[in-house]
């Protein structure tokens, strides 16, 4: 075959030479002797087809090139660069000029109250000022007096984020999406609300900030009505939309989302301040992955002094969101595997749940996964519901450490619930029934109010949410526990005994007391049948747990009964003898380590030598 190719090679070269000479002849005739060409029809026809002849000649050249013997080793060719099909963006990275904030911050007085994020300080108070401060605390549950005296446009000082965050660059292709910032408020203090708005305007790139939507959840304070409407007119991209009756955070956010015009929805609370470069990392992550629901690193604005906790360059101990089996959101330190996965501070933190107050999400994805459960009422449980839904239905929750936003964390809510706090239990029942499968039993044992709602079928229609779960082909809750939150301790689905532990001698119940997170003495208290501080489980591992929230175990030390974090946490752990208990047939509760039994002495729980004839050593789960 190779010999045949070589014999034909000279013939092909001769043919190519003839074609080339003919083409030159035609070009010469075409240019220098138009009249002669017109006199000879055959030449006129060939000259008119000169472009086709040229194409034929080039094709012949390519054909011969393809059959020429190739070198077996040639210089490496650089890989082809895939050019973006998005012609509306340029290659490379955004420049600082392109990411210029919507508004420049006005000149700052470094000695003004709270300047550069410092604490508000005041040494001497008049009676009138003291009264104003106390009224502010009563109404808002933070120091509104201090907030009112801090500039609405205060600076937060220099950018103290880690160097990799400060130096982070953002690609133009795909372009960073635009965002609508949605802020829900109800009778919010004037200064905290507007400082939140100004903070967004002074830190968000103009090309990315489409609008700020203030959603009023039926505020009654006069300053939040016409005065606010008139004030925001000067802020250009800020507008107010209103709910005429109090419906709560969930429906207010849905209202804001329904009128938002940008590609991404960014939700903030009404008492926040945004740090340098907070927005770009959130939007960049969504540009990479539309299913990412991203939260900033939320730092504290002190509720008393309004001091902003600025980020540090090194050594930040990050937290992530979690939940307990009463379906309460909380924070925990990162597990070791998550620390190892992250190479530097630009890497997102995977989080099993999120606080839900401050986050960004693609508007299209928000709608795809079912927005919020619009049958949930007011506030409570919506963040845990959305956490389960996002993870189980193919998305992911992440915290972006390079994005820093301050938040005033209050110790209690200043607002009343139109239907009382039962709305929280109702919301939690809805999320448990839709997303938790059989694991919902664990929750109902800890919340008797919720369990009663289920028995009475008093939590609304969930058929639409169940249909959503089916349509999205979501994972079950077991998948979530194994793949998203394997560190979560799962109590027995069907514990041996659970409920309150009643002493037959005193007719009182064992009680952990108020705010006992372990280390405090237990007490005896009137049995109230409400669970809570009197809820215990006797497990298949034979430990006695008080595990409404944190997993706490009874342990015996001499004659003392104690409460501490359970030593058995699942695989590769065991129950120590001083946490192991035997519930005997004659109603004693005997500790395996000490051999002593639980008793009530002087109306206090204690340990004593076992005596089945002593009524103060007899106990019953009720």
UniProtKB/Swiss-Prot annotation:
Q: Which domain of life is it from?
A: Eukaryota
Q: Which CDD domains match?
A: pp-GalNAc-T
Stretches in topological domain Cytoplasmic = 1-8
Report the subcellular localization: Golgi apparatus membrane
Q: What is its main location?
A: Golgi
Location of the Ricin B-type lectin domain: 506-622
Instruction: Reply yes or no: does the keyword Glycosyltransferase apply.
Output: yes
Identify the residues that bind Mn(2+): 269, 271, 407
Where do the annotations place UDP-N-acetyl-alpha-D-galactosamine binding? 511, 514, 528, 533
Any Pfam family from its record, for instance, is: Glycos_transf_2
Q: Which residues lie on this side of the membrane: Lumenal?
A: 29-622
Q: Name one GO cellular component term.
A: perinuclear region of cytoplasm
Q: In which pathway does it act?
A: Protein modification; protein glycosylation
Identify the cofactor(s): Mn(2+)
Molecular function as annotated in GO: carbohydrate binding; metal ion binding; polypeptide N-acetylgalactosaminyltransferase activity
Known catalytic reactions: L-seryl-[protein] + UDP-N-acetyl-alpha-D-galactosamine = a 3-O-[N-acetyl-alpha-D-galactosaminyl]-L-seryl-[protein] + UDP + H(+); L-threonyl-[protein] + UDP-N-acetyl-alpha-D-galactosamine = a 3-O-[N-acetyl-alpha-D-galactosaminyl]-L-threonyl-[protein] + UDP + H(+)
PANTHER family linked: N-ACETYLGALACTOSAMINYLTRANSFERASE, POLYPEPTIDE N-ACETYLGALACTOSAMINYLTRANSFERASE 6
Q: What is known of its domains?
A: There are two conserved domains in the glycosyltransferase region: the N-terminal domain (domain A, also called GT1 motif), which is probably involved in manganese coordination and substrate binding and the C-terminal domain (domain B, also called Gal/GalNAc-T motif), which is probably involved in catalytic reaction and UDP-Gal binding. The ricin B-type lectin domain binds to GalNAc and contributes to the glycopeptide specificity.
Q: Which family does it belong to?
A: Belongs to the glycosyltransferase 2 family. GalNAc-T subfamily.
**Role played:** Catalyzes the initial reaction in O-linked oligosaccharide biosynthesis, the transfer of an N-acetyl-D-galactosamine residue to a serine or threonine residue on the protein receptor. May participate in synthesis of oncofetal fibronectin. Has activity toward Muc1a, Muc2, EA2 and fibronectin peptides.
For this entry, the protein name equals Polypeptide N-acetylgalactosaminyltransferase 6
